[in-house]
């Protein structure tokens, strides 16, 4: 589904926009064909931020959560915005204008910095709280989300987390010609989700 502030999402990104994702869980709870005890979430980049929040706030309703390159704290600090996100070459488009678009009435760099301070999971006093079981994937060479944010998440909470860190990978752990998205998804993420949900992984014919 589209995350807050993107695509057809009905609301913009904000410190409380995770309420939209909680409504999705409410809806799934009304569907008779859905096993309410085996709901998982997977998030990528900004989606990984929301996935991390949901792993904390909706721990009781999520069986497990996998996230790729989740920003947690340093990503939202002024120094990182100015030194790493502004003019970032790893992102396919102009990242700062793209970030402005997910927030309501944010049109300047100073406003981005102000909004980002509110989004930090440390500033929201969430990092360190209990979480659902998590798989955290990242690349050490990521220029969009600092690897320190990943380690900060791994070091927090109440239960051990599974990690897949590619020392030669960039954003999402991708490595050109070695670890493209399909390989990461099929060989790392899907087996982990299947194992944690008690489901049989798809064979190579699917």
Describe the predicted segments one by one.
Residues 1-8:
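Conserved alpha/beta-hydrolase
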Residues 130-131, 136-138, 142:
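Short beta-strand/loop motif that positions the catalytic acidic residue
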Residues 169-183:
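Catalytic histidine-centered segment of alpha/beta-hydrolase-like enzymes
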Residues 43-47, 51:
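Gly/Ala-rich beta-loop-alpha elbow adjacent to hydrolase catalytic centers
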Residues 154-173, 188:
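Catalytic histidine neighborhood in serine/cysteine hydrolases
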Residues 56-115, 132:
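Hydrolase active-site cap/lid region
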Residues 132, 145-155:
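Short alpha-helix in the alpha/beta-hydrolase fold that links the catalytic acid
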Residues 12-38:
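Alpha/beta-hydrolase active-site loop
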């Amino acid at each position: 589904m589209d995350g807050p502030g993107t695509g057809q999402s009905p609301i913009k990104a904000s410190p409380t926009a995770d309420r939209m994702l909680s409504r999705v869980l409410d809806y799934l709870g009304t569907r008779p064909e859905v096993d309410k005890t085996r709901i998982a979430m997977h998030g990528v980049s900004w989606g990984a931020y929301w996935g991390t929040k949901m792993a904390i706030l909706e721990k009781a309703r999520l069986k497990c959560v996998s996230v790729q390159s989740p920003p947690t704290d340093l990503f939202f600090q002024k120094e990182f915005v100015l030194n790493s996100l502004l003019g970032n070459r790893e992102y396919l488009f102009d990242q700062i204008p793209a970030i402005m678009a997910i927030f309501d009435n944010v049109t300047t760099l100073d406003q981005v910095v102000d909004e980002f301070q509110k989004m930090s999971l440390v500033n929201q006093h969430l990092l360190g709280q209990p979480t659902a079981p998590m798989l955290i994937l990242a690349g050490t060479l990521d220029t969009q989300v600092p690897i320190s944010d990943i380690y900060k998440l791994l070091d927090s909470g109440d239960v051990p987390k599974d990690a897949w860190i590619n020392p030669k990978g960039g954003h999402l752990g991708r490595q050109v010609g070695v670890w493209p998205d399909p390989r990461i998804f099929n060989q790392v993420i899907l087996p982990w989700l299947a194992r944690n949900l008690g489901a049989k992984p798809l064979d190579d014919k699917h």
